[in-house]
Amino acid sequence: MQKPWVEKYRPQTLSEVVGHHEIIKRLTNYVEKKSMPHLLFSGSPGVGKTTAALALAKDLYGETWRENFLELNSSDERGIDVIRTKVKDFARTKPIGDAPFKVIFLDESDALTSDAQNALRRTMEKYSDICRFVLSCNYPSKIIPPIQSRCAIFRFSPLKTEDLVENLKEISEKENLTLEKGGIDAIIYVSEGDMRKAINVLQTAAAVSDTVTEEIVYKVASKARPDEIKKMTQLALNGKFVESREQLYNLMIDWGMSGEDILIQIFREVPNLDISEKEKVHLVEAIGECDFRIVEGSNERIQLSALLAKMGILE
């Protein structure tokens, strides 16, 4: 069975990692000196945190990286027992070969409970001579200050468009795909700097056709084209409520889009609308209120219809 492309084309060394040049430079220095502090990687999903941690381990240990590297996903194993058993058992044993220390990688560490984080802090202190911890998280504010203060913090930003484009073209060439300009632009739009999402969308589109077009990308990603969102929004702003609501229903039924997805796309379109700054402020406020109501469990169609109605009377 064919591997997912995100694994097939995952960088194996730090030099292969796409983007984040300053971060990679600092990590490479750690490898060269065979010395590093505990690390905290923060950033949104799909921007390279796990890839950087794996590449760091492979560069540090070479062929013995599996014996000296432990990866745990904290969202699955988030309790204090994991810290007391798996983490402590691995941390207390000496490194294999000539490695100066072992590395424990805790993915999604912001999912750890408060008790588990306090136990982790004590473990980090106790075994710091033979073990280093690399923590990754989406929300660093959920990591307790005592752990943050013990780590060198690396903030991974969403990948730049040129980095995404270069990688997508390289993968397309290896997979014998024709990647149209519109297809690239569509993948960039739906992925929002998330390389994992971009590669997954490309692979899904490739299963439909060897020529990746704009239409195919939006269809497999269950996203509306920006011009469709803009058309619906513009109709509402012009007071054509019934027509804009019809466009909304088409998106939800024909494209199978959730209300939350449509709302996010409307929000992304606000800066491009031909309305005053004051009206944009009121519109964003209305979008925020709509989002809150949907999250609380209100009917998506009713709330989005109400938002479109409000657009027609913006002041």
Curated annotation (Swiss-Prot):
Classification via Gene3D superfamilies: 1.10.8.60, 1.20.272.10, P-loop containing nucleotide triphosphate hydrolases (3.40.50.300)
Cellular compartments per GO CC: DNA replication factor C complex
Organism of origin: Methanococcus maripaludis (strain C7 / ATCC BAA-1331)
Entry's Gene Ontology BP terms: DNA repair; DNA-templated DNA replication
Keyword list, A-Z: ATP-binding, DNA replication, Nucleotide-binding
InterPro entries documented for this protein: AAA+_ATPase, ATPase_AAA_core, DNA_pol3_clamp-load_cplx_C, DNA_Rep/Repair_Clamp_Loader, P-loop_NTPase, Rep_factor-C_ssu_arc, Rep_factorC_C, RFC_lid
Subunit structure and binding partners: Heteromultimer composed of small subunits (RfcS) and large subunits (RfcL).
HAMAP family: RfcS
Protein name: Replication factor C small subunit
Binding positions (ATP): G43, S44, P45, G46, V47, G48, K49, T50
A Pfam match: AAA
GO molecular-function term, one example from the UniProt record: DNA binding
Role played: Part of the RFC clamp loader complex which loads the PCNA sliding clamp onto DNA.
Protein family membership: Belongs to the activator 1 small subunits family. RfcS subfamily.
